């Protein structure tokens, strides 16, 4: 089957409504992009759980709709603009999408990733480049965490240097389970992974089975009582601040905590919240993101 892409550039206030209308009228998928990306006018947009974003699209937005060959792009766009009440149909471009082996194309975009001194994150369709390395087999999926993002890399590097055999580890916000699996491969025991998303929990379980790593996963209400030698949380700054008391309470006195998902400009604010519980500072920065690490005081 052949496909077409309908590309429309328009003002921010109409982007979301047009996207919804195109989907209602039969578009297979719709994405909204910054029409000024890779130019001096590019606008970064960030959002975090617990915060209401100040805007949901770019001032100059590009709507890209994927259509099957039996849809006429001009007719579909005219109907969509009429549905949302635009006075006239915006200018558009139609691009033909060549039929490809999408599985092979997707796989070609993911190569083994070296991390730290001896870690490789390897998709299942690749062989490990170094047979003596500490290998995590992980395919890209729905849950966050494949080692490619700076925050995941920072946490993995910290765990590689910090985990001692037999230590207990809690990975809070485990996503794909990559950090919990690494902790287990570094000798930690027991290892617990917690995530608010049931789909992430299931994905993490499958990844642990594939890597023959015994990790216990669950939702937040299944988080065991007690304290851990190491707590790691790669989430985002706002949830980290909201959960500071709870996360710090999970660290044994003298135990260690690592936090990421934090932009460099947010580091001082997050550290200030945790400072009442732990001695904490920026451990390392990479591509504008930081990993904060610290030790829980003997009493607080």
UniProtKB/Swiss-Prot annotation:
Query: Which catalytic reaction applies to this protein?
Result: L-lysyl-[protein] + 3 S-adenosyl-L-methionine = N(6),N(6),N(6)-trimethyl-L-lysyl-[protein] + 3 S-adenosyl-L-homocysteine + 3 H(+)
Tell me the compartments it is located in: Cytoplasm
Keyword Transferase attached: yes
EC numbers listed for it are 2.1.1.-
Q: Which InterPro entries match?
A: Ribosomal_L11_MeTrfase_PrmA, Ribosomal_PrmA_MeTrfase, SAM-dependent_MTases_sf
Q: Which GO terms describe its cellular component?
A: cytosol
**Which positions bind S-adenosyl-L-methionine?**
152, 173, 195, 234
The kind of enzyme this is, by top-level EC class, is transferase
User: Which is an annotated GO molecular function term of this record?
Assistant: protein-lysine N-methyltransferase activity
The record's section on CDD domains has: AdoMet_MTases (cd02440)
Highest taxon above the source species: Bacteria
Classify the main location.
Answer: cytoplasm
Instruction: Write the record's keywords in alphabetical order, separated by commas.
Output: Cytoplasm, Methyltransferase, S-adenosyl-L-methionine, Transferase
GO terms for biological process?
A: methylation
Please give the family membership noted in the entry: Belongs to the methyltransferase superfamily. PrmA family.
Function noted in UniProt: Methylates ribosomal protein L11.
The entry's protein name is Ribosomal protein L11 methyltransferase
